[in-house]
Amino acid sequence: MPELPEVETVRRGLESVVTDAKIVSVQLNRRDLRFPFPEAFSERLIGRKILELGRRAKYLLFHLSQDETILSHLGMSGSWRIENDLLRTAFSMTSKLVKHDHFIMDIQTRNGDVYHLIYNDVRRFGFMLLVDTDKLYKHPLLNKLGLEPMSHGFSGRYLQKAFVNKKVSLKGVLLDQSIVAGLGNIYVCEALWRSRLSPQRGAFTLASKTVYARELANSLAQNIRNVISEAILSGGSSLRDYMHVDGSLGYFQHAFSVYGREGKECLQCGTPIIRILQSGRSSFYCSQCQK
């Protein structure tokens, strides 16, 4: 599933084209994705402008004229891409993939160019909702989200407060979107390895008032920030279906230290990387370095 860096990369790729563009036509190739498309979705979009493209956690936010916002989630395999009559991505030439183009929105930019904004989703686990902009952050999908790793208030102190009395694992708490919004399995594994913390360690152990616990929490917060920042600069991680809006791939997966490296040597100490299951998800870590 695309995590914060992948969604932010998509946002940046779309932003320069879609901002202030007018929606001139909408084509729905099916009635639903994970959820049904909003009622009269096409009719409600045509003629509006996309004022701004935002993001909250793993959600893309197309802020429209007339005070509504398209809330888009990529699910497991969703992707957005941009094409026009002169530009065709390598992706668009593959008919096997194009058959999963479920939503096509033609937009006209400020200088009169027309682009096709296309949503493709093989597994159809993504979705789009139309929400009143003034009620957007009260929506159930957004109103309980925690701080994002790159936000001003995200710190070791914030994590320590969040970890108080948490008997569950560090991995489990960090994946809780009400605590850290946008963080997912890949980047939690990477940040924990950099912090020398086991994914199985109880989160509460970093919540004490000792200098040692405070240092661990500060290190973890900084490493989460670093991993997310580096992943964004690398265009995210392309493992299965994720790609950029031009059809190209992210390359942060080539910098993984632990994720997907089961049995390979730890880059720090040479001990084989272990894979375990936690709540049905794979965790990769070094039993020697991470305690």
Swiss-Prot record:
Active-site residues, as the UniProt record annotates them: P2 (schiff-base intermediate with dna), E3 (proton donor), K58 (proton donor), R281 (proton donor)
Record has Iron-sulfur as a keyword: no
Cofactor annotation comment: Binds 1 zinc ion per subunit.
Gene3D superfamilies given in the database record: 1.10.8.50, MutM-like, N-terminal (3.20.190.10)
Alphabetical keyword list: DNA damage, DNA repair, DNA-binding, Glycosidase, Hydrolase, Lyase, Metal-binding, Multifunctional enzyme, Zinc, Zinc-finger
Sequence positions that bind DNA: H100, R123, K166
Record's function text: Involved in base excision repair of DNA damaged by oxidation or by mutagenic agents. Acts as a DNA glycosylase that recognizes and removes damaged bases. Has a preference for oxidized purines, such as 7,8-dihydro-8-oxoguanine (8-oxoG). Has AP (apurinic/apyrimidinic) lyase activity and introduces nicks in the DNA strand. Cleaves the DNA backbone by beta-delta elimination to generate a single-strand break at the site of the removed base with both 3'- and 5'-phosphates.
Protein name, per record: Formamidopyrimidine-DNA glycosylase
